[in-house]
Amino acid sequence: KYNNNRVLVICNTVRRCQDIYNRLSEKMKLQRSDSSHKLIDDRELNMLHGKYIYADRVEKEKAILSFGKIDEDGTKDNRKGVWITSAIAEASLDVDFDILITELSDVNGLFQRMGRCYRKRSWTGEGHNCHVFDGGKKKCSGVGYNIDEGIFALSKEKLKEYFKTSPSKLK
């Protein structure tokens, strides 16, 4: 159910963004050499964060806008793959991805991030198309650095409370 999609991964820090990109890139290279994983070959893997030099960042932004474009009638092209980004993608980019995987930052940031997934379409698929990593017993990247610890903890607590009392809202 998650094949052939455009996936957006949003990380709280550039370091986490680069780490995930590098790990996935290595995994894709390994899978490309294995004939049982041919589908991986026609998927794109890209990264965008705020530490690129200006010219490179402009090119990356053009590329993600092209990749995440949906026509007014809700039609998307046949491209598929993964964009791994820092929080730069949560605002000001008019993109529409199929699947969102994100670290929790705070509720405001989470709503912005969710707005990059099925932006101009209605979700009609099975399962979930937004996945939020809350850090478990550890903190997500950036907490205590660019994300206030108190706001993060409150956001995490309230989200867990909400979904605990409203499990049907998960769809």
Regions found by a protein language model. Give the residues of each.
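Gly/Ser/Thr-rich loops at beta-strand to alpha-helix junctions
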Residues: 13-17, 88-90
